[in-house]
């Protein structure tokens, strides 16, 4: 006999677990299936903007994560070709509840969310790999491969939060439209004192060869250094090349310890729909962007919690299922109109090869640095990712505070300009 839930979520990453917690808080019975033996600690996006801190506080886990992670209020942009570095500092803004961004590992966020979700009855099953689904008139049956053989689970709804290579999306026959970039990114976690070299707690390094995103991850001196390399280089030897790249970023210092590393391809893609029959998508399974600027995690989490709100309302009989199509349309709009263009512009600026354009980028960065509102604009842009929360009595109806501040972010196309 298949086990019955209101919702099955595939994927126990931060989006999957935050979505599970949000659904459980609405009273839904939730089962999470994760193919790995435990929550994975891999180098991935680790910055939570003020627009996401709203979610963490509403779900009741922000204080716990603040105690684990690192609160950052500075952002550095470095253009070595011109010997230029700028620092933008975020300051308190009246009407905005947070003046910092939280740096925390995805594994910590997922773990804390899981612990809170389990207290509400969410079942989290590791070593459960989704291998088949059967969408029926009254719900969906999911087959998972386990160490003890295949098991089946039944639910009204299935959410794929299982990453850019989503099995759920593939099994549901949902196309992942867009393109994949020719470059490969390598994300590394490293113990090294970047501050002594003039880096800030979060940094863009703009260079046509040695672009990088460098950020402090915790209070113990662990940093994320993510850089780009040609995808034609052999994947199996990427670790050997890390030291060559570090030579440039660390200016010849050998005083570092590599903790972990992970290569991955970059995408600008979204599901052609995020709702098909009884299957829904969230996180990178719904839409995947290059990581420049941290908007992928931000938008993925917002897609998950908006989905939890509308789906919870459907389960309770407060909303018609048609709201799920509106959810799909709105989250795809936010991705293609806000997230993807901004992340694409960030990536372009970081790796720009044209000398004339690099001069223009330098001027834009200088202007940002000289603008007294620069820190505010940098911080506020990510609120555009919230979009329409679709219900007048949504849990998130008051999440966007930007209409109440004196700065207008409507015309901004990205975080820098």
Which residues fall in each region the model found?
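Conserved FAD-binding catalytic core of PHBH/FMO-like flavoproteins
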Residues: 115, 157, 161-266
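Conserved mid-domain beta->alpha element of the FAD-binding
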Residues: 11-21, 113, 160, 258, ...
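Core beta-strand elements of the Rossmann-like FAD/NAD(P) dinucleotide-binding domain
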Residues: 3-5, 148-157
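Active-site-adjacent segment of FAD-dependent monooxygenases/related oxidoreductases
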Residues: 44, 48-118, 216, 339
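N-terminal Rossmann-like FAD-binding beta1-loop-alpha1 element of flavoenzymes
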Residues: 3-32
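A conserved short coil-to-beta-strand element within the FAD-binding core of flavoproteins
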Residues: 126-140
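C-terminal helical "tail/cap" subdomain of flavin- and related membrane-associated enzymes
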Residues: 310-417
């Amino acid at each position: 006999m298949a086990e019955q839930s209101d919702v099955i979520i595939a994927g126990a990453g931060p989006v999957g677990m935050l979505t599970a917690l949000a659904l459980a808080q609405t009273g839904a019975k939730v089962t999470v299936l994760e193919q790995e033996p435990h929550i994975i600690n891999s180098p991935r996006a680790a910055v939570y903007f003020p627009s996401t801190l709203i979610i963490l506080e509403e779900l009741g886990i922000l204080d716990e994560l603040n105690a684990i992670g690192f609160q950052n209020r500075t952002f550095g942009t470095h253009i070595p070709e011109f010997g230029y570095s700028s620092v933008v500092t975020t300051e308190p803004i009246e009407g905005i509840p947070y003046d910092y961004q939280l740096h925390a590992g995805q594994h910590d966020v997922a773990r804390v969310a899981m612990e809170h979700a389990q207290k509400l009855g969410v079942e989290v099953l590791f070593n459960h790999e989704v291998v088949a689904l059967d969408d029926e008139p009254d719900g969906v049956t999911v087959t998972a491969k386990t160490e003890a053989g295949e098991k089946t689970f039944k639910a009204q709804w299935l959410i794929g939060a299982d990453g850019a290579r989503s099995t759920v999306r593939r099994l549901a026959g949902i196309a992942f439209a867009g393109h994949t970039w020719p470059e490969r990114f390598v994300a590394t976690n490293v113990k090294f004192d970047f501050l002594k070299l003039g880096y800030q707690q979060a940094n863009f390094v703009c260079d046509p060869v040695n672009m990088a995103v460098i950020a402090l991850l915790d209070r113990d001196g662990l940093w994320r250094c993510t850089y780009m390399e040609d995808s034609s280089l052999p994947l199996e030897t990427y670790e050997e090349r890390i030291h060559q790249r570090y030579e440039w970023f660390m200016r010849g210092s050998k005083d570092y310890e590599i903790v972990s590393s992970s290569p991955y391809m970059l995408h600008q893609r979204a599901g052609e729909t995020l709702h098909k029959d009884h299957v829904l998508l969230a996180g990178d399974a719904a839409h995947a962007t290059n990581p420049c600027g941290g908007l992928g995690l931000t938008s993925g989490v917002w897609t998950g919690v908006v989905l939890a709100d509308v789906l919870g309302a459907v389960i309770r009989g407060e909303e018609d299922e048609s709201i799920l199509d509106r959810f799909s349309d709105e989250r795809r709009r936010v991705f293609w109109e806000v997230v993807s263009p901004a992340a694409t512009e960030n990536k372009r600026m970081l790796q720009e090869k044209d000398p004339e354009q690099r001069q223009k980028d330098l001027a834009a960065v200088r202007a940002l640095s000289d603008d007294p509102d620069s820190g505010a604009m940098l911080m506020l842009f990510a609120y555009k990712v919230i979009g329409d929360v679709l219900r007048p009595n949504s849990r998130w109806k008051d999440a966007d505070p930007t209409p109440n501040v004196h700065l207008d972010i409507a015309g901004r196309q990205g975080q820098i300009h």
